[in-house]
Design a protein with these regions (language model features):
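Extracytoplasmic/periplasmic membrane-proximal domains and adjacent transmembrane bundles
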Residues: 12, 241-243, 274-460, 469-472, ...
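Transmembrane helices with small-residue packing motifs
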Residues: 45-54, 124-160, 215-217, 246, ...
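Hydrophobic transmembrane alpha-helices and their membrane-interface caps
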Residues: 1, 64, 72, 463-563, ...
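Signature of alpha-helical transmembrane segments and their immediate interfacial
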Residues: 19-26, 93-143, 183, 232-236, ...
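Solvent-exposed, membrane-proximal periplasmic/extracellular interface segments of envelope transport
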Residues: 163-257, 282, 311-333, 340
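Interfacial helix-loop-helix hairpins and adjacent transmembrane helices
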Residues: 2-21, 50, 56, 75-127, ...
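Short helix-loop junctions at transmembrane helix boundaries
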Residues: 45-62, 140-143, 431, 472, ...
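Transmembrane alpha-helices and their membrane-interface boundaries in multi-pass membrane transporters
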Residues: 1, 27-46, 54-93, 206, ...
Length: 639
């Protein structure tokens, strides 16, 4: 018996005809799968706030790249194929990779077709098992981004003196710098030299720059560094707070809260607001995940109260303005001259020194000059005493406001706040008339992001269904492709559960990107299954008298098993591009991994579904058509 040559040279005319036919067969599906990936990612543009600013560049980049890709698929790719695919060709069966894949895959798909209920049951069980996994995951707005630094924000009592704050700052900086992983420390107390910083002198901000991780002690993490420093920095009268410089500034600008979560207490009376704030603080203590708990001071500020005695000043022929002018000059200062340095002018002010301004006996002995009676001590003209009052009055929407602040560490943000809300509702119950509380900080962003995603997800599914309908000109096959999406979620749910990742906007963006990838693989499979049905109809006609169930089964298996390499290649390209990100490190990898994880897991499970279940569902659909309509619906591949 004479063996057939493994290589065959095809004439140019026939080669161009084959290339044209192959491009018509595949390009439509590839084009629409690319369009589906583009359109499924468009709802990311609906994200607002921080999440929008973070993911819009990603959406723009991906959209522009895929738009160019979709154009090249139907224009440049066929031309390049005609140039490079020439000479002698090997049949598909001569490729050892194809033979190996078909040898492994064909018995498996035959078993799946034979044991239909078992195959579908296993997939449904896996889908059902993923639901409680997703429900048990924690919730957070965005994955914590490691900035490579720490912002230490302790607060002390409102009436603290400048000298005491300076001493505390020096002690804290010395302790912080003693940590082996700390590179440098820079701290400040009070506000910066700008009109937009309203920080009181009791607020300290210290930026702690860390060394590269390669220089850290073995087994040390950033959380362990914070815990170790926090235990060393327990100073009486000082409440510690730990965050990061960039996220702290973002939170303060967007929500007005310098911690992860803030409970805003609104009311009409500062004393009542402070009492409610203390009750809330006591209820929040002990909740797992609540750290750096602190009530923003509403009382405790020290004021010098000067009550002028009108009868006494009248006896000395003085007016209230005369006495106020002396007090203002002594405490606030008065301009005595102006100095000129080059092109700049500076006013020179004079007032009492710090020690005298804070010294009540010295203020009482302040001499007020009179006409005809000589200097008179201020104590003889007014009652002087130190009283307490609010160090700062905060208002929002025309209501007085107090705030209970805390950070979340060692637990997800959503679960921590949810438990805190339940505890407060049970403890406080209904607030008195004129008082109410509101949750703010990063939790506010979490709620906004979840509301937006609840609108986006159904929108994504509708867009994908419409795009697939135009790809196949069949609502039934579009729905058949859409069924693959829940099974793609299985892998995403499993991998984020075992990786220990919380649900966030980044994870949701990863699932949105996964939808397009899963549908792309499914479209490639359905193209070849429809091609097998066309061959069956061309050979035996389209009637129940000429087509049997065995014919449908064999041609479906043949369509699924043949040309297995491009189907595997579609999945492999995605995995080869995504998997290296899981082992990436450095700034930014903390945000990228939650995006990539659901895509990696989903691509794997969707590939299993497409290879094993899609042919089975396709076969069952064709058997139903043959039984009910007497023929099968064949989707022709259009140019």
């Amino acid at each position: 018996m004479k063996l057939r040559k493994p290589y065959k040279k095809i004439p140019r005319a026939e080669r161009m005809r084959i290339i044209e036919m192959a491009c018509k067969q595949v390009s439509r599906g590839v084009f629409f799968s690319t369009v589906i990936i583009i359109t499924s990612f468009l709802p990311v543009f609906l994200l607002t706030g921080q999440e929008g600013k973070l993911f819009h560049p990603l959406a723009f980049t991906k959209t522009f790249i895929l738009v160019v890709d979709a154009i090249l698929v139907v224009t440049l790719a066929p031309v390049l194929i005609s140039f490079f695919m020439r000479g002698r060709f090997r049949p598909e069966s001569a490729n050892p990779v194809n033979r190996f894949l078909e040898k492994v895959y064909e018995p498996v798909i035959r078993a799946c077709v034979k044991w239909r209920k078992t195959t579908i049951g296993i997939m449904l069980i896996a889908l059902a098992a993923s639901v409680p996994m997703v429900m048990s995951l924690g919730r957070e707005f965005m994955p914590p981004l490691d900035e490579g630094s720490i912002l230490f924000m302790p607060v002390t009592l409102p009436d603290v003196s400048n000298s005491e704050v300076k001493r505390i700052l020096q002690v804290q900086d010395k302790i912080l710098a003693s940590e082996p992983e700390v590179k440098s420390v820079l701290g400040k107390a009070g506000r910066a030299n700008t009109a937009t910083d309203n920080s009181p002198i009791s607020m300290i901000e210290t930026i702690v720059m860390l060394k590269p991780r390669s220089e850290w002690r073995k087994g040390v993490t950033k959380d362990s560094i914070i815990n170790e420093l926090n235990s060393k920095l327990q100073i009486p009268g000082v409440t510690n707070g730990w965050t990061q410089p960039i996220i702290n500034r973002i939170n303060m600008l967007s929500t007005g809260i310098r911690t992860d979560v803030g409970v805003k207490v609104y009311g009409q009376n500062l004393d009542s607001i402070y009492e409610f704030s203390q009750v809330i603080k006591r209820d929040l203590e002990g909740i797992p995940g609540v750290k750096d708990l602190y009530v923003e001071p509403i009382t405790g500020g020290k004021y010098i109260d000067v009550n002028i005695n009108r009868e006494e000043i009248a006896r000395y022929n003085l007016s209230i303005d005369d006495v106020n002018a002396v007090i203002e000059t002594a405490l606030g200062g008065a301009r005595i001259t102006t100095t000129v340095e080059g092109r700049q002018r500076f006013s020179v002010n004079a007032r009492f020194g710090q020690d005298y301004r804070n010294n009540l006996p010295a203020l009482k002995n302040l001499q007020v000059q009179t006409q005809g009676f000589g200097p008179v001590p201020l104590d003889a003209l007014a009652g002087i005493k130190i009283t307490e009052g609010p160090p700062m009055i905060n208002s929002e929407n025309a209501l007085l406001r107090g705030t209970v602040l805390f950070n979340v560490r060692g637990r997800d943000l959503g679960g921590t706040v949810q438990e805190a809300q339940q505890k407060l509702n049970a403890s406080i119950g209904k607030m008195p008339k004129g008082f109410f509380i509101d949750w703010s900080g990063e939790y506010e962003n979490l709620i906004r992001g979840e509301k937006t995603l609840k609108l986006i997800m159904p929108f994504v599914l509708v867009i994908i269904f419409i795009a697939m309908y135009f790809a196949f000109d069949s609502a039934r096959e579009a729905l058949l492709s859409l069924i693959s999406l829940p099974f793609a979620l299985i892998g995403g749910a499993f991998i984020i559960y075992f990786w220990g990742v919380n649900l966030s906007v980044a994870v949701a963006v990863g699932f949105i990107a996964l939808f397009g990838l899963a549908v792309e693989t499914n479209i490639v499979m359905i193209i070849y299954l429809n091609d097998a049905m066309q061959q069956l109809v061309a050979k035996k006609g389209n009637s129940r008298e000429t087509i049997t169930k065995d014919d449908l089964r064999e041609y479906t298996i043949n369509g699924a098993a043949k040309r297995l390499r491009p189907k595997i290649m579609t999945v492999s390209v995605s995995l080869f591009a995504l998997v290296p990100i899981l082992w990436s490190s450095g700034v930014g990898s903390d945000v990228m991994k939650p995006i990539v994880l659901p895509m990696v897991g989903g691509v794997i499970t969707s590939a299993i579904y497409v290879l094993l279940v899609t042919p089975l569902i396709f076969l069952m659909n064709k058997e139903y058509e043959l039984k009910k309509f007497g023929k099968i619906e064949v989707t022709e591949v259009k140019p």
